[in-house]
Amino acid sequence: MYIDDYKRWLSADLEDPALTDELRKIEGLDNEIKERFAVALKFGTAGLRGILGAGSNRMNIYVVRQATQGLANWVKTQGGSQLVAISYDSRINSDVFARNAACVLAANGIRVRIYDALMPVPALSFATRYYKANAGIMITASHNPAKYNGYKAYGPDGCQMTDDAAAVVYAEIQKTDILTGAEMMSFEDGIARGLIEYVGEDCKEALYSAIEACAVRPGICKTAGLKLVYSPLNGSGLVPVTRVLHDIGIDDITIVPEQQYPDGNFPLSLIHISEPTRPEPIS
């Protein structure tokens, strides 16, 4: 069975040439083929997570499209705003996966609010609630090594999708052919039709205001003379974190230059992870 799936992918006119190259390189290597095609990534309350690459057991545009079609089928039964919020982090192909998800949703007549630049998970949760969306999608693999990416789904409350909702989405995913089953529209067409819009400045400002309103002693940082060293760990925190720090009065900030800007390879860590609770990325 998995050999048949492999041959189908190999003979298909895939949009991503890197996937075709990978499939050609593993031709005749049964273990490599089996690892990619014997099972599929399973969608659960935490969404999907897997190694980047070709096949149903890898993260690629076809797995993302299939998952999004399953999510779209569920959203269409929910009434409400018929809108989904999307964000993404600095991982490899995160922006590509986010745009593909937006294109599937738009093709299903579902409106999309997508960030125009990478933003972290809390920003996605906030946008989901701000726009009263039916769901949110975050392209991220959290603390996993650089070779991973993932697809997290959130409910209208901005929290992780419930077991019941995730089960329905998973059932819809299983009904969707991975290569041809997802509805698609170009990103540009989605913009032109008003189905895809970027998250507005009003939402971003509301996010920062909500964070700053949580201060236990407002104003104390302005006179505390604090000096901070901050590392975004090559992730998505640089813009929102420094914005909030400046807003609350902390201006003496030293940013670790090697980890300042987004880089999905997490190059400064010898094991290529961005997990702040482990010593390797910050040593």
Region roles according to the model:
Residues 1-4:
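Polybasic, low-complexity association/targeting segments
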Residues 32-37, 41, 149-270, 274:
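Gly/Ser/Thr-enriched, mixed-charge loops and adjacent short helices
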Residues 48-50, 55-57, 91, 119, ...:
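Short, glycine-/Ser/Thr-/acidic-enriched flexible segments
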Residues 49, 91, 152, 277-278:
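Short, cationic motifs built from Arg/Lys/His that form the positively charged side of catalytic pockets
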Residues 271-275, 279-283:
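Single conserved hydrophobic/aromatic residue that forms the stacking wall/gate
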